Amino acid sequence: MTQLTVKALSDEIGTPVDRLIEQLADAGMKKASSDNVTDEEKQKLLSHLKKEHGDKSGDAEPTRLTLQRKTRSTLSVNAGGGKSKNVQVEVRKKRTYVKRSTIEDEAKREAEEVAKREAEEAAKRVAEETAKREAEEAAKREAEDAVKREAEEKAKREAEEKAKRDADTNAQRNAEEKAKRDAEEKIKQEAARKEADELKRRQEEEAKRKAEEESQRKLEEARELAEKNKERWSAAEEKKGDMEDTDYHVTTSQYAREAEDEADRKEEAGRRNKKKKKPSTKDEQARNSGRSQRGGKGGRKGKLAKPTSMQHGFDKSATVAKQDVVIGETIVLSELANKMSVKATEVIKVMMKMGAMATINQVIDQETAQLVAEEMGHKVVLRKENELEEAVLSDRDTNAESVPRAPVVTIMGHVDHGKTSTLDYIRRTHVASGEAGGITQHIGAYHVETENGMITFLDTPGHAAFTAMRARGAQATDIVVLVVAADDGVMPQTVEAIQHAKAAGVPLIVAVNKIDKEDANPDNVKNELAQYDVIPEEWGGENMFVHISAKQGTNIDGLLEAILLQSEVLELTAVKEGMASGVVVESRLDKGRGPVATVLVQSGTLHKGDIVLCGQEYGRVRAMRDELGQEITEAGPSIPVEILGLSGVPASGDEATVVRDERKAREVANYRAGKFREVKLARQQKSKLENMFSNMTAGEVAELNVVLKADVQGSVEAIADSLLKLSTDEVKVNIVGSGVGGITETDVVLAEASNAIILGFNVRADASARRAVEAAAVDLRYYSIIYQLIDEVKQAMGGMLAPEFKQEIIGLAEVRDVFKSPKLGAIAGCMVTEGLIKRNNPIRVLRDNVVIYEGELESLRRFKDDVQEVKNGYECGIGVKNYNDVRVGDQIEVFEIVEIQRTLD
């Protein structure tokens, strides 16, 4: 007998030990993992598991018995040749015995199933017939109900229509009767009111008449009494003198005074009754009924009845109070409504009737506000916003006598034509060598003493970027000297200078420079200038032409004489005494001195300590310097000076005016700054709709953000204008910040936040700014010549342009034959007729010079060898990727895609 432990048995059958112990326990055998298990216990466990899993064949009586029988025998068979052979024969028999009760049970089950199916079918037929009958009955009932409902609804509709007609007829009849009754009632009430008014008027007249009669009667009685007692009173007068005379007047006038007082009281009561509001008919009836109710019981007569209506007796006037509305140049709609003492919605309604839409916070102009206020019946008082400014500027002492003044001469012309060199020779200095790159980048203002008088010169830049500077120079000048190089002739900035001079309406003197050069041609200059209406005097024109050489000093005196002669013709005068006024030629921010402005005095005398108003800035002049840097205390007309002490850097071209009161100057400056802000915001809001469609594609445009700092205001304007003109449809220059003065840490923070580059023109970054630049890795660049700055920005913009690609054909092959390859499909046997065929390049298949396929060259072979390229005149096999319809006579064109570096035009 084989015995195993529980643990070994679990390993053998692949069941966990704990699970096997539980199964043994369920079978009635408590075992541990180390206990032995006998064969009988195994059989018992197996029987238990079979029972548990529904297999009851273990202990059940077999219902079928199969018997197998096998018999063996030997059979002798004749094998031929007189021999016999024994053959083993085995007979197998198999017989199966089935228990009779099992057959009967199966037959019984089959009969039950047949009966059950027949019963179910019968029940199903009965149910179907029943459902069919019920459905027919339900349909019949629904049809009857539908007919019945339709009849009821028809009757109901007829009844409702009849009732509605009756109701309309009754309502119309009632309305007519009510209107008739109301009209009769109204007529009765009106008649009663008129009768009551007439009765009241007659009573008042009767009372007044009685009062007058009573007073007249008492007056007559007093007069009669006085006549009767006249003798007695005369005797009393003789005894008592003046005192008795007074008593007489008091005594005799007692009755008259009483009568007059009674008449006055009645008249005052009548006036009070007239002032009271006439009561309505209902209120009068209520008061009358109240009086009749109060008189019933004693002790309550004469008391006032409790009012039946809670409505006060004050009526708001229906007319609109007329207002004097003060309107400035602009006004907010809500403020206009407050000034007219009406709601803002009423103003909006009036504007809508006038054809204008507005919101409660919208700013409207003076003309619109005036029309609205007058439409609503108010008186309009128009007020100018710049009244204070006009008052301050008019309160100036400028009544002195005019005296001759020096001319202001602007030297203009193309770059490098010798403007500054001409002025240098006149001043006997060398200013040109001090300018970066040998070109003037500021407006230089100088005055020169000559033998024939003083002349003030303004030297303007000639570079294209300084258009605004040249325009300011032409506006502040009396005479323009146009310098033209005899070898170069008329250039673009020369033409622009002519246009500025004509726009300013100032005379033009042409100085033909560089006549000492071999290729100089002054006559050509005259011919070219004649095309722009600058005609020499010798040709019958009005313009003087002077041939000079700035380097040699040739005929410079002749130029000065021409200038003084022209100034004498103009008869230039100015007020020398009085408060000064002028124009800001240039301005900058000096690190040690603060805002510095170069002012050309045009009238009056500017003194140190004067209060100056310059555009949006103001201040007291703390110091004055001439063009040589020397301190001065006053400057007369046509003298350029640098002034210190302003509140900020003024804009070039602003008017500088001396005023009396610093407080008013500050108010005017603040008003101008606010006005500038309003105009700027209005311009931005106006451009929002105009730029809507361009802003929709703004994400596709590359932007170059720039923070610009320069030494003077004019350079900032010129550079900013030039950079903005570089913008194209693909790359846009965006100046996020600009200013005058050195580069500070704030500029670096702004550049870092906006991903911008910092451009410094003649300025440098301080120590903190340099540290911030290194920490933030911001691109900082310094420049001293403007065209170098513009060229580098143009290159940077070119690098931001999207690349452009071009297809370049490198080879052409002609298909001579077509082969089939099991791996690659159709292989074209080709002859290279042009250029070079390279592997893995894009190709086009041409048939009759028409492109029928574009793809990639997949296989290139020569003599069964894979090659990278095949040159002109050689044969090769070409496999086209994903294309098998190659025919003899086709052409295969091989090309390359080449990137073209783009630049700004």
From Swiss-Prot:
Pfam families: EF-G_D2 (PF22042), GTP_EFTU (PF00009), GTP_EFTU_D2 (PF03144), IF-2 (PF11987), IF2_assoc (PF08364), IF2_N (PF04760)
Xref: CDD domains: IF2_eIF5B, IF2_mtIF2_II, mtIF2_IVc
Annotated region described as G4, given as residue ranges: 513-516
Keywords, in A-Z order: Cytoplasm, GTP-binding, Initiation factor, Nucleotide-binding, Protein biosynthesis
Residue segments, region G5: 549-551
Region ranges (G3): 459-462
Role noted for this protein: One of the essential components for the initiation of protein synthesis. Protects formylmethionyl-tRNA from spontaneous hydrolysis and promotes its binding to the 30S ribosomal subunits. Also involved in the hydrolysis of GTP during the formation of the 70S ribosomal complex.
HAMAP family assigned to the protein according to its UniProt record, in alphabetical order: IF_2_B (MF_00100_B)
Name of the protein described by the UniProt record: Translation initiation factor IF-2
Organism: Vibrio parahaemolyticus serotype O3:K6 (strain RIMD 2210633)
Lineage: Bacteria, Pseudomonadati, Pseudomonadota, Gammaproteobacteria, Vibrionales
